[in-house]
Amino acid sequence: MSGERLKGLIEHWIEHNEEHRVRLLEEAEEAEKLGLKNVSERLRKAAESLGEASKWLREALKAFEQ
């Protein structure tokens, strides 16, 4: 695999994570409305984890330029 291909994959993963993060937050709101507080909290934590993963993926992209 080339460096450019790997960069492309990382960019894709960041975008993909963001799509899932947004969806998880939407579903957390729905769970809250249904009175499923424990489910909502865990969905929010999952969304937070995806945000953290994306942060590290962005750091990996920056590392290509170092």
Where in this protein do the model-derived segments appear?
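N-terminal acidic leader/helix
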Residues: M1-E30
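Short, charge-rich amphipathic interface segments used for partner binding and complex assembly
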Residues: E30-A63
